[in-house]
Amino acid sequence: MAAAQTSPAATLVDVLTKPWSLDQTDSYMSTFVPLSYKIMIGYLVTIYFGQKLMAHRKPFDLQNTLALWNFGFSLFSGIAAYKLIPELFGVFMKDGFVASYCQNENYYTDASTGFWGWAFVMSKAPELGDTMFLVLRKKPVIFMHWYHHALTFVYAVVTYSEHQAWARWSLALNLAVHTVMYFYFAVRALNIQTPRPVAKFITTIQIVQFVISCYIFGHLVFIKSADSVPGCAVSWNVLSIGGLMYISYLFLFAKFFYKAYIQKRSPTKTSKQE
């Protein structure tokens, strides 16, 4: 009997050029997951040695490039939010709040929400470039920054194939925040002065994002433990890791907010996330 032949994994070109197929995308992501670990390690190594290399060099003048970079991410986030948020509200109005993070509906299989949800996950790879701008411009790379970028990237990639329903909230919140945040950073890159409350507002909406996420994850833990919503699309491995991740984000950003705006040690500093 001839051995069964295994079909080759789908490629990035397949996902981008062929009609949307969740099976095809999952096939591609199965090969991208191991690569994501290598990318994360390369990212951390580049930060370390990049700072060493820049220690005795003049900072690069990347003002216009950085502005375009941030405007690009703001535009991408705005378009993705426009494509994904209406579906969230549709499920919310039709089936209620709990259903919006328990029921998948056709979130992953629909050609529009499926593609833009996947595009969001993949965007976390180029977002790592935010840190390279800090390194090349000899700006501080604080723990909160690289920890958030690295962990969000790997978590998004590794958990994609789980097709969790709560992702519609995670993506909607993150994209809404990033649309505003990256636009702000683009404006600041051009040395355009903004009122101090704007920076405070950016950090505040980041914290609100994590508060909402922590609430949803907390409720999902209760739902999963009591099996109060049969068929709720959430798994323990994703829930436990994601819950700890969001709690750590909330702690770090709240601590930053306290130091930057309550203790008033850094009058012009704002946090930059993914």
Curated annotation (Swiss-Prot):
<dbReference type="GO" id="GO:0035264">
    <property type="term" value="P:multicellular organism growth"/>
</dbReference>
<dbReference type="GO" id="GO:0010468">
    <property type="term" value="P:regulation of gene expression"/>
</dbReference>
<keyword id="KW-0443">Lipid metabolism</keyword>
<feature type="transmembrane region" description="Helical">
    <location>
        <begin position="201"/>
        <end position="221"/>
    </location>
</feature>
<keyword id="KW-0808">Transferase</keyword>
<feature type="transmembrane region" description="Helical">
    <location>
        <begin position="29"/>
        <end position="49"/>
    </location>
</feature>
<dbReference type="GO" id="GO:0006629">
    <property type="term" value="P:lipid metabolic process"/>
</dbReference>
<dbReference type="InterPro" id="IPR002076">
    <property type="entry name" value="ELO_fam"/>
</dbReference>
<dbReference type="Pfam" id="PF01151">
    <property type="entry name" value="ELO"/>
</dbReference>
<comment type="pathway">
    <text>Lipid metabolism; fatty acid biosynthesis.</text>
</comment>
<dbReference type="GO" id="GO:0009922">
    <property type="term" value="F:fatty acid elongase activity"/>
</dbReference>
<dbReference type="GO" id="GO:0030148">
    <property type="term" value="P:sphingolipid biosynthetic process"/>
</dbReference>
<feature type="transmembrane region" description="Helical">
    <location>
        <begin position="115"/>
        <end position="135"/>
    </location>
</feature>
<feature type="transmembrane region" description="Helical">
    <location>
        <begin position="73"/>
        <end position="93"/>
    </location>
</feature>
<feature type="transmembrane region" description="Helical">
    <location>
        <begin position="140"/>
        <end position="160"/>
    </location>
</feature>
<dbReference type="GO" id="GO:0022414">
    <property type="term" value="P:reproductive process"/>
</dbReference>
<dbReference type="GO" id="GO:0005789">
    <property type="term" value="C:endoplasmic reticulum membrane"/>
</dbReference>
<dbReference type="GO" id="GO:0008340">
    <property type="term" value="P:determination of adult lifespan"/>
</dbReference>
<feature type="transmembrane region" description="Helical">
    <location>
        <begin position="170"/>
        <end position="190"/>
    </location>
</feature>
<dbReference type="GO" id="GO:0042761">
    <property type="term" value="P:very long-chain fatty acid biosynthetic process"/>
</dbReference>
<keyword id="KW-0472">Membrane</keyword>
<protein>
    <recommendedName>
        <fullName>Long chain fatty acid elongase 2</fullName>
        <ecNumber>2.3.1.-</ecNumber>
    </recommendedName>
</protein>
<comment type="similarity">
    <text>Belongs to the ELO family.</text>
</comment>
<dbReference type="GO" id="GO:0019367">
    <property type="term" value="P:fatty acid elongation, saturated fatty acid"/>
</dbReference>
<feature type="transmembrane region" description="Helical">
    <location>
        <begin position="238"/>
        <end position="258"/>
    </location>
</feature>
<keyword id="KW-0444">Lipid biosynthesis</keyword>
<comment type="function">
    <text>Catalyzes the first and rate-limiting reaction of the four reactions that constitute the long-chain fatty acids elongation cycle. Uses malonyl-CoA to add 2 carbons per cycle to the chain of long-chain fatty acids. Condensing enzyme responsible for the elongation of palmitate (hexadecanoate, 16:0), also involved in polyunsaturated fatty acid (PUFA) biosynthesis.</text>
</comment>
<dbReference type="GO" id="GO:0034625">
    <property type="term" value="P:fatty acid elongation, monounsaturated fatty acid"/>
</dbReference>
<dbReference type="GO" id="GO:0034626">
    <property type="term" value="P:fatty acid elongation, polyunsaturated fatty acid"/>
</dbReference>
<keyword id="KW-0276">Fatty acid metabolism</keyword>
<keyword id="KW-0275">Fatty acid biosynthesis</keyword>
<keyword id="KW-1133">Transmembrane helix</keyword>
<keyword id="KW-0812">Transmembrane</keyword>
